[in-house]
Design a protein with these regions (language model features):
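Metalloprotease/metallohydrolase-associated module, dominated by Zn2+-dependent proteases
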Residues: 40-161
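Short pre-active-site segment immediately N-terminal to the catalytic Zn-binding motif
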Residues: 2-17, 53-54
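Generic hydrophobic alpha-helical membrane-segment signal
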Residues: 7-8, 19, 48, 84
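Active-site recognition of the HExxH zinc-binding catalytic motif
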Residues: 12-28
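Generic preference for well-ordered secondary structure
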Residues: 1-5, 21, 43, 81
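Short, charged cytosolic
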Residues: 24-41
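A generic, lipid-embedded transmembrane alpha helix
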Residues: 1-6, 27-32, 132
């Protein structure tokens, strides 16, 4: 109730900021050098030096950076009570879903860049991956969630052999 008036007044800017920040973080994770990031109420841009790829282009639609930031804090924290982290994970994931529903549409430049079918398939795959990590992390912690996810993924991939 305290932050709602601030959020409603600045919602367009905050969702655009989140979108561009996710592009920036994804490009840094891909070892590119950030050049600039501009954010306005209804549009923004992120420029970096290096190669682009589908992850950088579509990260804002499938990579909830604020939720992962909270998961990282949860990993580094000595606080044993998960309630505050669970609340923050819910709030940040809700914000990401709000951004996703507002920004994901067939005419979005990022989605058209790689083709709609490839883009939506990529987004769906990453949503499943992130949902499994986040849901498991809420109960068992991020470290166990990542280990479980990757062990399970490799086991399932190698099972036919």
């Amino acid at each position: 109730f305290i932050i709602r008036p601030f959020f409603r007044k600045n919602e367009a800017w905050l969702t655009t900021f989140s979108h561009e920040l996710t592009h920036a973080i994804a490009s840094i994770l891909m070892l590119n050098k950030m050049h600039s990031m501009k954010v306005y109420e209804q549009e923004g841009s992120t420029q970096y030096l290096g190669r682009s790829n589908i992850f950088i282009t579509l990260a804002p639609y499938c990579f909830p950076i604020f939720t992962y930031f909270i998961l990282l804090l949860m990993l580094l924290s000595s606080v044993r009570s998960l309630c505050i982290f669970q609340l923050l994970i819910g709030l940040t994931l809700g914000f990401h879903i709000l951004c996703f529903t507002q920004q994901t549409h067939p005419n979005q430049t990022d989605i058209k860049q790689n083709g709609k079918m490839i883009s939506y398939s990529f987004i769906f795959m990453w949503w499943l991956f992130n949902a499994s990590i986040i849901l498991y992390a809420v109960k068992y912690g991020i470290y166990r969630a990542v280990i479980y996810q990757f062990q399970g993924m490799w086991t399932n991939l190698l099972a036919p052999f």
